[in-house]
Amino acid sequence: MSNKDTRVVVGMSGGVDSSVTAHILKEQGYDVIGIFMKNWDNTDENGYCTATEDYNDVIAVCNQIGIPYYAVNFEKEYWDKVFTYFLDEYKKGRTPNPDVMCNKEIKFKAFLEHALKLGADYVATGHYARVRRHEDGHVEMLRGVDNNKDQTYFLNQLSQSQLSRVMFPIGDIEKKEVRRIAEEQDLATAKKKDSTGICFIGERNFKEFLSQYLPAQSGEMRTLKGEKIGTHAGLMYYTIGQRHGLGIGGDGDPWFVVGKNLDDNILYVEQGFHHDALYSDYLIASDISFVNDVDLENGFECTAKFRYRQKDTKVFVKNENENAIRVIFNEPVRAITPGQSVVLYDGDVCLGGATIDDVYKESGQLSYVV
């Protein structure tokens, strides 16, 4: 099938990355359609909606490069699959990653299904990742060429069938080249700042936002030996390894969050960046998704990331039970956070990932939840 007979539907956010993605595909001769996904009502307290501005940018870019465009509303799907999950995780005292769930349930499920109804052969997004296609039909996901921008961490839940329908045109180039192309083509988004943070919070204060949906209950802040240090504003506002926002004065090393007791509503803190309570030796993770087959029965060595832009850590992975894996670290790792993703790699190939449930010391002692 020639490029002109291949329809690619591009998820366009109104940012420079998806704009250049659409431009590249159009230049390569594909039949390109731009889709703006409205996942959240971004209207602020003054009645201003950032989604309107973003969609106007999508319209401008699509008109510039000469492709049709549509807006599709996925607010219900986003609420049901992403935001409800986000709140449920915080209720459990965990720190979720809504971007991972958004990619799994919205951008590469609801959006992909919609695109296929439009006759799409592929969907494309402005993610910094790569897809390697093999002659037998199976695919692999690779890190983006720009190590500083690689987004495979957030794509770890994508399946073989999803990836077989996906294109990442800017995964082979660096961010500065994306900007250069946008400026060279005088695209409307060429100078637009990259968006940061969680889309449904935007520029708002995180505590204020979360308190609108979940009641906060203040409680005691204690050391692991039981000494009362202060008062916390609500366990959901804190994450393992957090230093800022604790409100603890005094001399000596800074204080860090080292654990939570949900039953008694206690936040545990200790002094020192390298306090032993912040380190663990292995984790158990569920919601497992592997792009390709791996040998969980015998276990295998690979590297892992436990948060975005973290250096790879050498690990050994094996089955814990039919619903979970055990990831054992070659050396203790600091501040691994339940609710976040553990993402596994073999060189540049992203093998897949899972959601961190519990974190342990070598002795089998549970870390972080006392």
Swiss-Prot record:
Catalyzes the 2-thiolation of uridine at the wobble position (U34) of tRNA, leading to the formation of s(2)U34. InterPro entries: MnmA-like (IPR004506), MnmA-like_C (IPR046885), MnmA-like_central (IPR046884), MnmA-like_central_sf (IPR023382), Rossmann-like_a/b/a_fold (IPR014729). Residues 149-151, 307-308 are annotated as: Interaction with tRNA. Keywords: ATP-binding, Cytoplasm, Disulfide bond, Nucleotide-binding, RNA-binding, Transferase, tRNA processing, tRNA-binding. It comes from Staphylococcus saprophyticus subsp. saprophyticus (strain ATCC 15305 / DSM 20229 / NCIMB 8711 / NCTC 7292 / S-41). Residues 97-99 are annotated as: Interaction with target base in tRNA. The keyword Transit peptide does not apply. It comes from the Bacteria. ATP binds at G11, M12, S13, G14, G15, V16, D17, S18, M37, G126. This is tRNA-specific 2-thiouridylase MnmA.
